[in-house]
């Protein structure tokens, strides 16, 4: 089976996101508050006809507050010293922001009330408070609240206990400028469809997590032969293709290879709905596969929906796509158990967008405190 292998260029300045270094507002750099920071990434193309939009993603910490009440801000005495756990909150897509420097100032006074509830599994309820005008038209800000699986956005939900009020303060802001055609996610009911009349095409992406030699992540993920971190495999359901007469005439192997070549798939990663895999079909999309892509051939897959555990690892370390390949499987589970997977490497890793920048923001630290930061704690391996 022919292969196309286009490795990413690590030297390209467009392939990384600027890190969030830990900075304190004190002269000695050893105590004080964390300094709020913004990271900016441009995915817009010079000749793009799509109007630009901005994705805003925030990272920070959840604190417990004394239920006696009072006016809230980051220095309120009612907040207990030391964070409870780390959190990611994506505000989603919104209109173009002309001056990125205004975003940090706009977030002063903004915070999120966080509560736990439960249905089939633990859920987190986020209520946005004091939403700034600048961000009022971003997706989550317009809704004002969000209910989702607690494990998606909260690093360690088990640390949040009944009888406390919890507040999330964003500390690090990721601002991504991109064309509006990147605002497309595949409907979840479509991703869940299984039928004996179709084949499922999945994409396996191998990420290299750029962690330090003493990182606890090395105990969780596969060893990197190059010694640059560790490796993680993620599978994403790309699309379904219909079984037809051509398969019997040409054979499944040949048919699958021709479909992979004709679709001309590329893959990249960006910080939009959190760390997000972007798959683009630059060629012909089969009719059965059309619902999995936008009219421009784009499909965005937020990693928190696919692999929440890996997403949390990416809050604190950078990553790069080292390999991507397609897997053809029977869609029907009974048929899948009787057949072998077919694998092809007909994937291009999009040059300039195969890296997710390393961040010094580390949710695996125990004692980072926004109101009263006195020292950085030791690594928390939980």
From Swiss-Prot:
Entry's Gene Ontology cellular component terms: virion component
Main location: virion
Lipid biosynthesis in keyword set: no
Ligase in keyword set: no
Keywords: Viral matrix protein, Virion
Gene Ontology molecular function, alphabetical: structural constituent of virion
Organism superkingdom: Viruses
UniProt cross-references to Pfam families, sorted A to Z: Matrix_Paramyxo_C, Matrix_Paramyxo_N
GO BP of this protein: virion assembly
Compartments, record wording: Virion
Function: The M protein has a crucial role in virus assembly and interacts with the RNP complex as well as with the viral membrane.
Entry similarity comment: Belongs to the morbillivirus/respirovirus/rubulavirus M protein family.
Protein name: Matrix protein
Organism: Simian virus 41
Designated gene of the protein: M
